[in-house]
Amino acid sequence: MSRYLIGALLRLTAALPLSWGHALGTFLGGLLWWIPNPLQRIAERNLALCFPEQPRAERNRLLRRNLMETGKGLLELGPLWLWPRERVLQLVQGPVAGEEELAAAVNCKQGVILITPHLGAWELAGLYYSSRYPLTILYRPSRLGLDAITRRGRGRLGGQVVATDAGGLRALLIALRRGEVLGILPDQDISGIGDGERLFVPFFGMAAGTMTLVSRLALKHNAPVFLTW
């Protein structure tokens, strides 16, 4: 049932101008700020851990802005996953900084690792690069049974989407050996799949689990790493 509901919501938001979607996303974020929910609790806890010296009013201001941006990002999925190819790619305006260096690295055929955290326009970045390069994208399967929608959306412009499991790791290795591009969100938890171990390192004064997969692949295969967002 959730799959059909999500599909209907994606089609609805894809039918709207992007500015309308952003306005509705801001409204949705406001609701997430007022109504208790897991996204609110996690963000509130993280802000308290990272900025304990900040007054509660300032942390609440950051929390509200965070949830509004989250709402906008959620309502961008319909346009990104359903709009025609050219309309999606037109969202990337002007030259992309560093793309000449990226293209040169790809042409060396030794494999390239492209990393993007859950920050900024990372969904759009994946679509853009998969339209230009042979890209294998690592993702964590949804707990809501929405894998088919996610795979289709993220792979619609040519990317191969693989899960954070042993099969996905093999697919990454094969793509790297072919000299292709890997797309990895380095803030994912992929512990338990071989090279998916993590190290706990200081982050804003807290020990944060950090994947070692990217550094291991880069060192083992002499693959350059590019950051995008």
Language-model-derived ranges and their functions:
Residues 1-116, 146-152, 156-158:
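Membrane-anchoring hydrophobic helices of lipid-metabolizing enzymes
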Residues 28, 32, 123, 186, ...:
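Short, flexible micro-motifs
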Residues 83, 108-166, 171, 192-207:
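Catalytic core of membrane glycerolipid acyltransferases/transacylases, capturing the structured
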Residues 134-136, 166-229:
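Membrane-associated lipid acylation/remodeling enzymes share a hydrophobic transmembrane-juxtamembrane segment
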